[in-house]
């Protein structure tokens, strides 16, 4: 039964046939080149079989584009009886006829046998005469003079072979037989690989020099490919301000190239691609390497020097390697394999048994066979040689290394080195001295890496290793290119503002613009901080001006279909410097990592499907493709670390870290409702008044404290959810009010996040079982704890993060709570986050806590020092009203004596009652309750 082929299959078959013919002719040409060189010193007499002879045309009969100049010559191509193109016998460069004979009956083996080269099948014509392109080249086996029948031509040359006139020195650079050349005239005729030099019809000297460069295969530069006679032609035209478009016919090869350009944009209305002018040189450089496409330069840019693509260090041209990524599939192959990068210097070839393949492996000098895995590995310097040899085995298909791997490790393919080159030290003299002097050694390494990658990187350090300070330093290094845009979760926007004011004192506070609403985004400052949700509402013209962008918690962009990702990706691809910060780069879920890679290096994987096939173990299901898996993760890790990612774990830099790292997190004020703001304002106003008794003062403080708890609930929940989304699996959350604890547990329950809760109602037996459950849990788990009920007697060292949703006026209680994780058995540095809300009681509690800790430290009673280990401390700014309230806090909680202790105990008892759910009492409730007051007096009288 006949098999119906689709048009696509027919097209591929025809392409494969044309390529096979081109390779065959190239091998013939290489042999004939050696034979021609011999003819310079010795006559050659050979008997030629009759009936299948032909002559290649001279340079003068073919123009630069490969078309016949029939109008200017009596020689013209004719059709042979067998259907092939025929060509005349024409005068050679020295005035004599240059003839070439091809035997149609020779098999491929005999054509490539060097021992038969002396028989001679071709005499090579002048270099400048040759057009390129296998699909449109005349067949050298069917070439006849115009007006001559095949029979006549056969009779004419049936008994002898006319020896050509010796070539001049400028026509050939070497004599005698020798090894196969990397570039020959027939190679140019049929279109060599991407590294070939074009044949330019100029003086003999120029042609000779061009040939010499092609033969030696210089690694210093990549030479443009000779265009085929049927090449697709187009032009570059100015499109808009700082952009140009390409007007050209359809070319699959060109479309694939377009998709790798960072500034690409496709207009479906005109069906044309346009690009930023900054990518003009790189695009034209790549087009030069395509044989099938020719583009006219952009008007006014004709004189721009188009730098050739870089070559690898040992003579291997990167374009030759990249060319192997095209058309490697062989539908008829019986054995399939693939290449996988296993280290910076070696790759494996995974393939089944095949005698010829094993024979090739044993020819490689750097081969290594692992008897356990039964796999062969080789140094990268053998990659090109091995792949070229494997391609000659028709029954075998081997998937090459991906293009990004070839680009990232390009120097290794020329000369492999196991030791990574040391990244040069960056000059930070232009950065604020306060910032540069506070960088730890590993943080300085991160800055060096970023600058070596031209400010485009994924900073994936573990949590608590100072990604914020590194990002600020990198951005400050590129300060001349500001304005700067910082995109962060809404819960940490003001934390970023505080960090800029602390580490860059040269920046005026009014230069930092925190975008809170959509209306705030209509103007840009020097530093602009916006949430992911508000990014899409920014004015597009303003957003386009940002050339330096920081994305905090960049894993928020993992889903390409979300609005936040759609708003961010165009900005990131067009920006000059992009810093993505993420403590959890999702290496086990490569599909979630794709958008971050595309943001930093758009040219790596223009199509997600290609990435998914290689690294997501993509499978085609009845409903579509499934990209949820993972594959080749080690190769992906090596690729990212070599190109865009730097990641350090706490265990690697633990010796440089303090035991505790405190961080003040300023939560967003918009989380406070208008009603709560009014209540806070009323409470603050009440506190600013004078009070007749200290009890009334304490009661006013208690009311203000409770209002603060209500105001912070929304922001606290948002911060906890951000931590969970960031991949934090186990941490502690301390709060004081029952209202706050209830809301946290309720939200965790809605999200199906496992948690434990320990407060004043939890029995001693239950406490121990809950602690054991938390310690042994291997999955995510959050411990929701009361500050006063769970600040001692518990061990929760399996976590290394503590979050204080509320502050407490007694710093000793806070330090005890911190030590629930900072205990024996803790092997990591502990991170402590204090959530502080402006416009609340935190304005006065936070500086008061720091001052108390400082006094204790000076007295030698405390090792903890908030001011030295907290990332942001310059938070409290006093005005007359704030000063009054602050003095009230200080006076209420710092006086000595039994009366003060009684008042503090009264406040603590009231807070504990609030923790159990009692309503907030009015200012007269406690002062009028003589029984309760007597009970407390009796307690202190004991």
From Swiss-Prot:
Residues 24-214 are annotated as: Disordered. Residues 5-29 form a coiled coil. It comes from the Eukaryota. GO terms for molecular function: ATP binding; ATP-dependent DNA/DNA annealing activity; helicase activity; hydrolase activity. ATP binds at residues 461-468. GO terms for cellular component: nucleus. Residues 34-71, 79-88, 129-138, 149-162, 171-187 have a biased composition (Polar residues). It catalyses: ATP + H2O = ADP + phosphate + H(+). The keyword Transmembrane does not apply. Residues 104-119 have a biased composition (Basic and acidic residues). Residues 719-872 form the Helicase C-terminal domain. It is found in: Nucleus. This is SWI/SNF-related matrix-associated actin-dependent regulator of chromatin subfamily A-like protein 1. It comes from Xenopus tropicalis. The gene is smarcal1.
């Amino acid at each position: 039964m006949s098999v119906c082929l689709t048009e696509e299959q027919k097209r591929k078959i025809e392409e494969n046939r044309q390529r096979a013919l081109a390779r065959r002719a190239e091998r013939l040409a290489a042999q004939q080149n050696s034979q021609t060189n011999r003819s310079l010193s010795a006559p050659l007499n050979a008997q030629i079989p009759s009936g299948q002879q032909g002559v290649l045309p001279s340079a003068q009969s073919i123009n630069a584009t490969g078309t016949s100049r029939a109008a200017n010559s009596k020689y013209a191509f004719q059709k042979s009886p067998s259907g092939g193109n025929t060509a005349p016998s024409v005068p050679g460069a020295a005035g004599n006829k240059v003839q070439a004979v091809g035997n149609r009956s020779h098999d491929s083996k005999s054509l490539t046998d060097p021992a038969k080269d002396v028989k001679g099948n071709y005499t090579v014509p002048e270099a400048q005469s040759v057009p390129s392109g296998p699909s449109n080249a005349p067949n050298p086996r069917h070439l006849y003079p115009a007006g001559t029948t095949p029979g006549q031509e056969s009779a004419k040359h049936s008994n002898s072979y006319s020896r050509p006139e010796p070539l001049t020195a400028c026509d050939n650079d070497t004599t005698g037989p020798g090894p196969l050349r990397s570039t020959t005239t027939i190679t140019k005729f049929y279109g060599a690989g991407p590294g070939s030099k074009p044949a330019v019809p100029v003086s003999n000297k120029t042609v000779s020099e061009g040939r010499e460069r092609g033969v030696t295969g210089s690694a210093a530069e990549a030479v443009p490919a000779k265009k085929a006679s049927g090449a697709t032609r187009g032009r570059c035209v100015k499109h808009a301000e700082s952009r140009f478009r390409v007007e050209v016919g359809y070319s699959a090869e060109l479309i694939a190239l377009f998709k790798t350009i960072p500034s690409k944009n496709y207009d479906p209305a005109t069906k044309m691609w346009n690009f930023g002018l900054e990518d003009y040189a790189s695009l034209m450089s790549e087009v030069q390497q395509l044989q099938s496409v020719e583009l006219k330069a952009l008007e006014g840019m004709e004189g721009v020097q188009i730098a050739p693509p870089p070559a690898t260090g040992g003579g291997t041209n990167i374009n030759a390697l990249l060319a192997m990524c095209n058309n490697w599939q062989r539908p008829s192959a019986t054995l399939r394999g693939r290449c996988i990068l296993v280290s910076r210097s070696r790759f494996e070839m995974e393939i089944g048994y095949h005698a010829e393949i094993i024979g090739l492996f044993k020819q490689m000098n750097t081969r290594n066979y692992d008897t356990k895995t039964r796999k062969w590995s080789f140094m990268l310097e053998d990659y090109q040689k091995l792949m070229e040899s494997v391609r000659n085995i028709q029954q075998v298909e081997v998937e090459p290394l991906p293009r990004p791997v070839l680009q990232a490790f390009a120097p290794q393919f020329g000369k492999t080195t196991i030791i990574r080159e040391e990244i040069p030290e960056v000059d930070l003299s232009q950065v604020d001295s306060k910032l540069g002097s506070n960088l730890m050694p590993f943080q300085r390494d991160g800055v060096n890496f970023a600058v070596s990658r031209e400010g485009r990187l994924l900073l994936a350090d573990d949590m608590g290793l100072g990604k914020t300070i590194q990002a600020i330093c990198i951005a400050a290094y590129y300060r001349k290119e500001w304005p700067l845009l910082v995109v962060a979760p809404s819960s940490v926007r003001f934390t970023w503002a505080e960090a800029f004011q602390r580490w860059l004192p040269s920046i005026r506070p009014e230069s930092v613009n925190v975008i809170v609403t959509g209306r705030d985004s209509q103007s840009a400052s020097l530093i602009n901080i916006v949430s992911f949700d508000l990014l899409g509402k920014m004015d597009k013209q303003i957003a386009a001006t940002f050339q330096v962008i920081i994305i905090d918690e960049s894993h928020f962009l993992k889903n390409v279909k979300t609005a936040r990702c759609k708003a961010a990706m165009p900005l990131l691809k067009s920006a000059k410097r992009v810093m993505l910060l993420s403590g959890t780069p999702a290496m086990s879920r490569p599909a979630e990592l794709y958008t971050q890679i595309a943001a930093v290096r758009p040219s790596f994987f223009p199509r997600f499907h290609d990435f998914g096939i290689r690294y997501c173990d993509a499978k085609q299901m009845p409903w579509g493709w499934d990209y949820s898996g993972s594959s080749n993760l080690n190769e992906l890790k090596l690729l990212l670390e070599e190109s865009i990612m730097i990641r350090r774990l706490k265990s690697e830099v633990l010796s440089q870290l303090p035991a505790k790292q405190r961080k003040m997190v300023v939560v967003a004020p918009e989380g406070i409702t208008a009603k709560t703001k009014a209540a806070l304002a009323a409470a603050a106003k009440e506190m600013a008044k004078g009070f007749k008794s200290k009890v009334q003062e304490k009661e006013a403080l208690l009311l203000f404290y409770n209002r603060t708890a209500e105001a912070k609930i929304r922001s606290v929940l948002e911060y906890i959810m951000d931590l969970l989304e960031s991949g934090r699996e186990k941490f502690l959350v301390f709060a004081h009010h029952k209202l706050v604890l209830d809301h946290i547990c309720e939200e965790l329950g809605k999200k199906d996040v496992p948690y434990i809760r320990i407060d004043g109602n939890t029995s001693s037996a239950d406490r121990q079982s809950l602690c054991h459950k938390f310690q042994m849990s291997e999955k995510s788990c959050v411990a929701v704890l009361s500050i006063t009920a769970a600040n001692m007697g518990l061990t929760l060292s399996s976590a290394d993060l503590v979050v204080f949703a509320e502050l407490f006026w007694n710093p000793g209680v806070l330090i005890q709570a911190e030590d629930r994780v900072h205990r024996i058995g803790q092997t990591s540095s502990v991170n402590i986050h204090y959530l502080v809300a402006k416009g609340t009681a935190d304005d006065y509690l936070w500086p008061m806590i720091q001052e108390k800790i400082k006094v204790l430290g000076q007295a030698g009673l405390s090792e903890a020092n908030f001011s030295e280990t907290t990332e942001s401390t310059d938070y409290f700014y006093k005005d007359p009203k704030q000063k009054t309230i602050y003095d009230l806090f200080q006076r209420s909680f710092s006086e000595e004596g039994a009366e003060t202790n009684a008042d503090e105990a009264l406040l603590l008892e009231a807070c504990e009652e609030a923790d159990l759910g009692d309503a907030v009492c009015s200012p007269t409730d406690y002062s009028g309750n003589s029984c309760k007051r007597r009970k407390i007096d009796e307690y202190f009288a004991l």
